[in-house]
Amino acid sequence: MKDWTNYQNKTYGDDACKLIIDFLDKYKVDSAIDLGCGSGNETVYMVKNGIKVLAIDRQLNQDFILNRLSDSEKQLISFNESSFEDVELPKTKLLTAFFSIPFCNPNNFDELWTKIYNSIEDNGYFVGQLFGDRDAWNVVESINTFSIDKVKEYLKNYNIIKLEEIEYVRESDNKKWHFYDIIAQKKVCDKHE
């Protein structure tokens, strides 16, 4: 298991991902799951916007989140320390996964994606990222990367609100990034199928 402590320390207190900020500017939800919450920046942002959040991470640092919340805001947060491979997901209106689920064991990714789908209520939302197949990490066997066609296949039971392909080289370490920003609304199931 990779130790995420350094990453969490490095990203603690960063601004929330623009994707969740943009989403919450347009859509209202009352509950969310932040899957792979890391240092909790998006979790804190959602709670501060009045959303009840279940924060899940395999290496959960609750203090990183709780230290940034008022006593009343702390009533909106719950935690679950679990790996992607073992996680159980309750029903929710919004499931977020910011640069997290590509780190699921590749042998378990399809199962995780099914759990995510089953967790999201009809007309609920998935907001997050998947790594593209031209990302520098595409050669790392333990990391999931996807072609645009594969991403669209994963989203076939969703109405795609945003699917933006982003590709650049980060100057600080010359790492090639290729990922997809996703906002998708789960289609209503036809009970007669």
Positions of the model-derived regions?
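Conserved acidic residues
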Residues: 30, 93
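Short catalytic micro-motifs in class I SAM-dependent methyltransferases
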Residues: 99-100
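A short glycine-rich, Lys/Arg-flanked "PGG" loop and its adjoining helix->strand segment in the class I
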Residues: 110-122
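Class I (Rossmann-like) S-adenosyl-L-methionine-dependent methyltransferase catalytic domain
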Residues: 1-28, 38-88, 107-111, 125-193
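A conserved beta-strand element that flanks and buttresses the S-adenosyl-L-methionine
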Residues: 96
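ABC ATPase nucleotide-binding domain "signature" loop
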Residues: 103
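Conserved beta-strand/loop positions that form the S-adenosyl-L-methionine
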Residues: 35
